[in-house]
Amino acid sequence: MEKDIIIFFDTTLRDGEQSPGASMNLKEKLLVANQLAALGVDVIEAGFPISSQGDFEAVKTISQQIKTSSIAGLCRASEKDITTCWNAVKYAKKPRIHIFLATSDLHIEKKLQKTRAQILDMAVKTIKYGKSLCKDVEFSAEDAGRSDMDFLCKVVEAVIDAGATTVNIPDTVGYTTPIEFGNKIAEIKRRVPNVNKAIISVHCHNDLGLAVANSLSAIENGARQIECTINGIGERAGNTSLEEIAMTLKVRHHYYNVKHTLKTNELYNTSKLVSRLTGILVQVNKAVVGANAFAHESGIHQDGVLKARETYEIMSPADVGVPESLLVLGKHSGRHAFFKRIKDLGYKLDEKTLEHLFEKFKILADKKKTVFDDDIIALIEEDTSSGKETFILNYLSATSGTGTIPTATVKISKSEGNKKTKSITLQAAACGSGPVDATYKAIDKIINMDIKLTDFSLRSVSSGEDALGEVVLKAEYKGTIYSGKGTSTDIIEASAKAYIQAINKAKLFYDNKKGK
């Protein structure tokens, strides 16, 4: 590995999924993993294998299917964790074990209730054990941003001696500033005698909005792996945004003088995919991938861009993969055109899924005069997000109007039995403050789950009076947030689909937890 190559370590499937409501099923995680591989991500952190059986299976499956990127699993500094992690990632062509252990006095004393000497011993022993299983082992010094510098350097030196191939310096709580963090990386590079035997990595959180700036400062001072997520998602205020780092290094390559192997024209597709699967919308003014990233309203700016794009644009839409034109399909479009458009949009789907999507496309095309790219993407994401469904919407009728009480009637199929092979149809009606509220109350009567709607948003997927509407929502069940989304030309139907998807996610997670 050349010393001036930046390694992109994507943790969307692990840290990114810790955003409330951002949990994904196995099918969705595979979609993201395949797209990250298409983007050219060097390392995909697929999950935390010991945290749940679902996470273990996801990491194992991704390890078996992705062949171009290294696949990492996160684990604590314990032999049990490391063994479980290895059992999940060992199927990968390029597996990595990622061990973390806190090094700040606050965490050592308050959380772990240990001494510095004990932490140093744990770090060395667990790295050696990890190395006995896997040749690629990463060590993360949790809360390095607030760790004593002398002790941090001592730990870094010791774990490299023990066999760590990458040492990660996280700003776990997003506390440091760019100058501070850059100086910390520079000091590690200067003081640790064996530092050149490992890659120095950084993992910055965005609590003060400085994650990208801190990561860039780290690059200037010798860090060569950046841990990040698509759209910057993650717990609390999120993580370093992969697309912002990638395009900064591309646009300002003469300043940073480093290289990377990402295919930046896949950034837009990757951003859209993650947004749709997690239910976390990208703000319109988000750098690089936001809807307004290449929009110009000022007359002076518009005039300049028309004369020479570089007057007000430092990068082109094509650099990040924004489609130059939207291909319009309709009810007369055939399989070939539809399948080709799906491929052009960056999706790799099996023949059975493609045929199923084509049938859904024809139904939509009968309702809409024109079907745009965003309509097709919405169909794909809705279809691939379903997972195992306990409840399926069969019928919906909702009425409302001036001077009338909104009412709704729904019929839902409920799968029963251990293998969900039997189903019964249930019906309920309810009144509400509006047609969506009435629909949700009718659904609640059937599902018999104490689920609470916490967030609801509706947007038009495409243009025109017959536009496809997309509802994205979050619902809480037994203390956990689940996301749901639904699309339809009927916004009441889209709302019902989104609610039922969140309910199915909650039911699946809770049943798995109970071992059903």
Curated annotation (Swiss-Prot):
It catalyses: 3-methyl-2-oxobutanoate + acetyl-CoA + H2O = (2S)-2-isopropylmalate + CoA + H(+). It comes from Endomicrobium trichonymphae. The keyword S-adenosyl-L-methionine does not apply. It comes from the Bacteria. GO terms for biological process: L-leucine biosynthetic process. Residues 6-268 form the Pyruvate carboxyltransferase domain. The keyword Protein transport does not apply. This is 2-isopropylmalate synthase. It is found in: Cytoplasm. Residues 392-516 are annotated as: Regulatory domain.
